A protein has these predicted regions:
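Short coil/turn segments at alpha/beta junctions that flank glycine-rich nucleotide-binding fingerprints
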Residues: 31-35, 86, 107
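Helix-turn-helix
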Residues: 20, 24, 28-62, 66
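Generic hydrophobic, amphipathic alpha-helix propensity
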Residues: 17-25, 42, 67-75, 79, ...
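Amphipathic alpha-helical packing segments from all-alpha helical-bundle domains
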Residues: 70-80, 123-149, 155-160, 182-185, ...
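Amphipathic C-terminal alpha-helical segment
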Residues: 103-106, 142, 159-179, 189-194
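Amphipathic alpha-helical segments used for helix-helix packing
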Residues: 92, 104-124, 171
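N-terminal intrinsically disordered/low-complexity leader segments
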Residues: 1-16, 27, 86
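Hydrophobic alpha-helical connector segments
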Residues: 66, 80-106, 158
Length: 194
């Protein structure tokens, strides 16, 4: 095997391991919380040596940022896919809410990690995660801006209310009680358009 092919194979193996590392980190952060999950736990779950984990990520906080990035990418993909069907502003918002709830309640570790409060980390990492969150929230801001509400203040309050209600479902939701679509419709029924 020539050197170029060997480097290509190493890069492919590295990429394959990266997905496993991220999945294991999301699982450990979800099950144990950020503070209690150790790099050793994550490496064990990924089937690798603890030292090998540092090849991919220099610190646990960098690994958390990568899990957040992947989690937000996944949820964003679901929400934007749900918005490809035409509909009224209210129907579009409902579709986005259903997709958000399906991601959150579908048992995926990434979504559970993303909605938790951010642990202590350096300012650059915190800014990256806040930027990712803000970019995701812009999808909902655009949908809410299309609703016939009287003021921007009402739009802001509605956005905050919806995110609080949607994200809190993970606390009280029991599988089989209601479908995410029923929950989203129920939340929207509480809000009267003016």
């Amino acid at each position: 095997m020539n050197q170029v092919a060997g480097q290509r194979n190493l890069a492919v193996r590295r990429d394959n391991r990266l997905g496993t590392v991220l999945d294991s980190a999301a699982k450990c952060f979800c099950e144990r919380g950020y503070d209690a999950a150790s790099m050793r736990d994550i490496a064990r779950d990924a089937g690798m040596k603890a030292g090998s984990l540092y090849y991919h990520f220099p610190s646990k906080s960098e690994l958390l940022v990568a899990v957040h990035e992947e989690g937000i990418r996944r949820v964003t993909t679901l929400v934007t896919s749900a918005l490809t069907r035409p509909g009224s502003p209210r129907k579009q918002l409902e579709a986005a809410m259903v997709a958000h709830l399906e991601a959150l309640l579908g048992g995926g570790d990434y979504a559970q990690v993303v909605i938790r409060e951010l642990p202590e980390m350096n300012e650059e990492q915190r800014c990256r995660l806040i930027g990712l969150r803000d970019d995701y929230e812009k999808i909902f801001k655009k949908l809410i801006d299309a609703l016939p509400l009287e003021t921007d203040r009402m739009r802001r309050h509605l956005r905050l209310l919806l995110f609080g209600a949607l994200n809190w479902t993970r606390t009280w939701y029991q599988a089989g009680d209601e479908a995410p679509s029923d929950i989203a419709k129920g939340f929207l029924e509480l809000i009267k358009e003016t």
